[in-house]
Design a protein with these regions (language model features):
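Short, solvent-exposed loop/turn segments at secondary-structure boundaries
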Residues: 42, 62-63, 102-103, 162-163
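Residues that scaffold the ATP/ADP-binding catalytic core of kinase and kinase-like folds
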Residues: 51, 159-163
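N-terminal [4Fe-4S]-dependent radical SAM core
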Residues: 1-89
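Conserved SAM/AdoMet-binding glycine-rich loop
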Residues: 82-160
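Conserved small/polar residues in nucleotide/adenosyl-binding loops
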Residues: 164-168
Length: 168
């Protein structure tokens, strides 16, 4: 038996959540209407060649809907397809979900965390869209709630990154 209480040689994410939260945890994607510096003209326009959010965004994720409504529809959506979850992680997935002023992030993340059954948040973003102030805020949330930050690092080679941009 390994230190994480399993006979597997790896500590699975789902196993970690079951041990931490006492049951199945489901990620619920939301679209908060964020953009990206490679889409809005700050760095580039049109986005990167690999970034096709339509390919993975569930139909209920519409930025015009409130975060709460998207969570409710996401719970219903996943409830029809999978075993019932005991807790939820709200997944800010589309584009760069820290690419906004801190007050906007506080409002959006706060709405998600206030929803019943939400154990935490998962935030997809770019390393260049996170500063010390935002990290301090996420650390503040993480004192009481689960927080994961997914940094989209498509390559560590600058030449390759230049090829990824659709306007390069």
């Amino acid at each position: 038996m390994y230190a994480w209480g399993d006979h597997r040689r790896f500590n699975s994410y789902s196993g970690y959540f079951r041990r931490t939260f006492g049951g199945r945890v489901q990620k619920i994607s939301v679209d908060a209407g964020f953009s990206c510096p490679n889409r809005d003209g700050k760095i580039g326009e049109g986005g990167c060649t690999f970034c096709n959010n339509g390919a993975f965004t569930p139909s209920y994720c519409i930025p015009a809907k409130s975060i709460g409504r998207q969570i409710a529809e996401g719970i219903e959506f996943h409830g029809r397809r999978y075993r019932a979850a005991s807790r939820y992680l709200v997944y800010f997935q589309s584009f760069s979900n820290t690419y906004a002023p801190l007050e906007r992030l506080r409002a959006l993340y706060g709405e998600a965390l206030a929803y019943p059954g939400v154990a935490g948040i998962v935030i997809g973003t770019r390393p260049d869209c996170v500063d010390a102030e935002k990290l301090d805020y996420l650390a503040e949330i993480a004192r009481d709630r689960y927080v994961a930050v997914e940094f989209g690092i498509e390559s560590t080679c600058d030449e390759t990154c230049l090829l990824y941009t659709s306007d390069a």
